[in-house]
Amino acid sequence: MDPLRRKQAEMLFSEYNRELAKVYDKILDDVKSEVDFAAPDFQSMLQNEVFNCLQPWFSKKLDGLSEDTPEGFFDSLITLDDTMEVFSIAAQMVDGDLPDLLMLRLGAFGEEASMRLLELAMAGEWIRGEGVEDNAFRDGILIHMAALRILGLWNIEMALDPVLARFLNIDAPDELVAESVRDFLVPYGEVVVPRLIACLDEGSEGGLVGPYEYLVIGLTEIGKENASEEIFQCLRRVFRSMEHKVIASVCLGDYGDGRAVPLLKGYLDRHTHDVDRQFFYETLSAIKRLGGDIADITDPFRDFSSKK
């Protein structure tokens, strides 16, 4: 890509960030109730509103662009090499979701684009090197993690096995890597469920620590939209095997199947004086979310003893 086009891309994404911030501010200023913020579909509504409000901006003249408008700039990307370079610039600069017109342009190259994205995702260093600061490490993998998330959004099935294999080889994944892998997995929905269940069953003897914790969270998110007996039974097994049971407890509460109440209450009853404060209260919250009664649960920390 020639230096002028690169400079124009950088300018475009700077302006995109400004417009994106204005759109978010306007939408959020119109939300007056905390109840609205807490609504289950709020994030989905927000994304749709942002998408709709941004559309006119792409067809407006932007000084400094040879093609006059952002839409014209993206349409002018003829080669995959140029489009990938613009994608890399966007991944480093854009504050929120990448522009849809850029994603459409990239998607127009079909399987070749998917292969390039997979190569880019796998080329990054997923483990922070010794002496490398967290921020420097994360800045260095922004492009690779953006490619990973796009592969998930596009449901590129050939990416699943290599990504899972690499992730599960990381003992203590960085938060950005872990969240990117989760964001990669969730859009696949029920397609990826058998793989996740198999991974969790295989990792159960090791206590399901590190990367497995994020697979549990991802499976739960998928299960909220694609509930199945297999997912519920897997989460039950995870609770019994998991070293950090607070994660499994929260996930059972989030998944929403009331059959988990006896499991959670039974565990609290048997381990009243063994559990820590965080686990106890997160599990109480999970039981309540599942419709269970907590009045008969002994409070080992006596925070509510006066009410009993």
What are the residue ranges of the model-derived segments?
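Short, solvent-exposed linear motifs at loop/edge-of-secondary-structure regions
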Residues: L46-D63, G140-I141, L153-N155, D254-G258, ...
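Structural detector for internal amphipathic alpha-helices that build alpha-solenoid repeat scaffolds
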Residues: P99-E112, G131-I156, A165, E175-V191, ...
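Generic detector of short, well-ordered, non-transmembrane alpha-helical segments enriched
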Residues: E49-L54, I143, V216, H244, ...
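N-terminal alpha-helical modules
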Residues: M1-V94, L98-V132, H144-A146, P162-R166
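Eukaryotic acidic, Ser/Thr-rich intrinsically disordered low-complexity regions
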Residues: K265-K308
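Amphipathic alpha-helical scaffolding segments comprising HEAT/armadillo-like alpha-solenoid repeats
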Residues: L80-A90, E111-E133, I156-N169, E190-G203, ...
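Basic amphipathic recognition helices
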Residues: P40, E243-K245
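Short coil turns that connect the paired helices of HEAT/ARM alpha-solenoid repeats
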Residues: I89-G96, A123-E130, D134-D139, L168-L176, ...
